[in-house]
UniProtKB/Swiss-Prot annotation:
Protein's recorded name: Methionine import ATP-binding protein MetN 2
Residues annotated as domain ABC transporter: 2-241
GO cellular component annotations of the record: plasma membrane
Family the entry assigns: Belongs to the ABC transporter superfamily. Methionine importer (TC 3.A.1.24) family.
EC number annotated for this UniProt entry: 7.4.2.11
Keyword entries, A-Z: Amino-acid transport, ATP-binding, Cell membrane, Membrane, Nucleotide-binding, Translocase, Transport
Family annotation (Gene3D superfamilies): 3.30.70.260, P-loop containing nucleotide triphosphate hydrolases
InterPro entries assigned: AAA+_ATPase, ABC_transporter-like_ATP-bd, ABC_transporter-like_CS, ACT-like_dom_sf, MetN_ABC, MetN_ABC_transporter-like, NIL_domain, P-loop_NTPase
Catalytic activity annotation: L-methionine(out) + ATP + H2O = L-methionine(in) + ADP + phosphate + H(+); D-methionine(out) + ATP + H2O = D-methionine(in) + ADP + phosphate + H(+)
Subcellular location: Cell membrane
Enzyme class: translocase
Single GO molecular function: ABC-type D-methionine transporter activity
Amino acid sequence: MIELKEVVKEYRTKNKEVLAVDHVNLSIRAGSIYGVIGFSGAGKSTLIRMFNHLEAPTSGEVIIDGDHIGQLSKNGLRAKRQKVSMIFQHFNLLWSRTVLKNIMFPLEIAGVPRRRAKQKALELVELVGLKGREKAYPSELSGGQKQRVGIARALANDPTVLLCDEATSALDPQTTDEILDLLLKIREQQNLTIVLITHEMHVIRRICDEVAVMESGKVIEHGPVTQVFENPQHTVTKRFVKEDLNDDFETSLTELEPLEKYAYIVRLVFAGSTTTEPIVSSLSTAYDIKINILEANIKNTKNGTVGFLVLHIPYISSVDFGKFEKELIERQVKMEVLRHG
């Protein structure tokens, strides 16, 4: 269990004070994958570096498995960092060491006997899919392979928490998915708690259980990924979801001719089992109306499917539209009116 209570981080410069993290409260379940998303400058990197005290909070508490991180002694903090490990965007490998020796490095620092350290490193090489590359140097590896070494090294001391600081940002889409699949496998095998920060909604959607959205140092929205993706509340969250959907439909709406009276353009959002139900055809029959599908999209999250439909209804009376909306609510389908005549 990880708890952040009223965490604040301020930086003082010559001319002003910068509030990088602004009274953040979070509760992260043990064994879950928790994502923090935000644009550049939102404060997410500063936030994650306070989990293992690479940054000290100006005020507030960071509590991991009952330990108040800011109250630990030097030796206590050193021991805790072995259990709260971290991987980085640019891998941070030792270029003069082979794959195997990079993975052995934290074990050497921890005083593990060489034979045991080597055996552990070989097991991790196999876990992350690098068997046969033990003697390769970082300069001989692809970006995805380097990140696999980084992950193996981070797992060397059997951590309970893995922090991922933009771990896939330097990778191409296919390699990103491979690394995300590896993180999922590791979480399941080792019951890790994973906290990752990113600016990509695809990453959040693919592996996270819950997400917090940051802007200007504040958490502006948080909750289960499916819920946040299905019903974003804040402008920033809506922008992330829109980018993930590649949705430029609202822009093209302005180019449409004015609608006739009693005509509507609506967006429906489906989740779970409703994504496979023939709702549009049944409503079209029930209300004897024509429904044109202007746009459709389905996205898979780790915990379920979310579907999006944009519909054009050429004519429906106000009374029937009210019934139409009520029936959608009963079927747990969300509706947003984009335009009406």
